[in-house]
Amino acid sequence: MTLDEFKQNVASGKIKDKWYFYKRTEDNKNALVRDMSSLTEFIKDKFNLDIYFVYGTLLGVIRENNFIEHDNDVDFAYISKQTNTTEILHEFYGLCAILKNHDLLSKICGNGHIHVYSPNKRNKFDLWTSFILNDKFSLVPLFDSTLNSSLILPLKQITFKTKNFLIPNQAENFLNATYLDWKIPLLETKGTINPWKKIL
């Protein structure tokens, strides 16, 4: 399926309209990026946690220096500071509680995955939990101690649409481990190598 065919299917109702990025103006995307940056600052200030791009957002930034046109959400992850899964979950639900107190928690989707609002509440983002145990990296919901931590750490800073964000240390290798043929746009499938699984 080409992007034009995808757009036609959205227009005809064959594909549900989820306000995909191709429908957004540049001004809207730039406002979204400002809200993304505000969230990274909020999480750093309140929790001393760095959040970084993962999944489709990282793919778009690396492949196109843009959002993927047929995507419709933003994916961040944070790296837990804890050293076992019990503490990681305790930290996660503590994070949820504080976000709820600030009226920024939209939904707990499962252990290690939430929908969180930007501080101005104009936009909502996916926030996933990642952690490193015994030098092995895990990320909800695809990676369960299957990657070396050197693929992720140290996180690297990039500039995306005038704002600074963090990405995995070896972003292309991370994408190689995540997606089938990630350098080629695939509209029919997310193309992930691993199935979703329960990590926490």
Identify the role of each PLM range.
Residues 1-54:
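Helical scaffold of the NTase/Pol beta-like nucleotidyltransferase catalytic core
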Residues 178-183:
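Glycine-rich, aromatic-lined ligand/substrate-binding cores of catalytic
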Residues 77-79:
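Short hydrophobic/aromatic beta-strand micro-patches
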Residues 82-90:
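Short, flexible/disordered intra-domain loops and linkers
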Residues 43-74, 85:
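Active-site nucleotide-donor binding segment shared across nucleotidyl transfer reactions
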Residues 28-43, 95-148, 152-166, 173-177, ...:
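Conserved catalytic core of two-metal-ion nucleotidyltransferases
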Residues 13-25, 46, 69, 93-108:
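Short N-terminal helix-initiation segments at or just after the protein's N-terminus
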